[in-house]
Amino acid sequence: MPVFISIRMSTLRRAAIGVCCVVLAAVFLWRSAPADTTVFAPRGETPVTVVVDPGHGGEDGGAVSSGGVEESQINLELGLRVNDLLRFCGQKTVMTREDDRSIHSDGANTIREKKSSDLRNRVAIVNAAEHGVLLSIHQNSLPSSPQTHGAQAFWNGQEGAQALAEAVQAALNTAINSERPKEAKAMGSSVYLMKNAQAPGVLVE
């Protein structure tokens, strides 16, 4: 059921580069942390592969802005910019999607089948990445609380995820949450991708 994002697209576009730089900085700080504080891919080992996952896509548009823009388009715009910046800095990346489509397999016909297949394929992409780290991009929606804003990071149950989420959150608080800092939180088991990814995962929304 569609819900609405009470944020203007012009604001999102202005913030996009800042968010990308925040994520980029957090990933590199996390990777270069001292060995005794890093639990995944410590300095000197094979570099990680960042799997950039723009949430939703295709028929699954996610939430909808007050101007009629679907969440899937916003996620994709941010995901492409994050991917470009990471690659520009020499970071190996993989994207789960690079255009506004579902990545379900052939044979999925109903909306439910397509959604289930799409999620399974995203999990497969993450789990196939060498030394993978998942960064899933979403937009939260709280139409009953229009004063609520900002970005928050959530981690999955894999080793290293909490440290990365906290690094991302600290950078987000400095960049865009200065008035109302947020805390990174553990993601519950209800999010299929985060639950089944066999790599440290951070969902930002």
Segments from the language model and where they lie:
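Catalytic-site microenvironment of enzymes
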Residues: 1-205
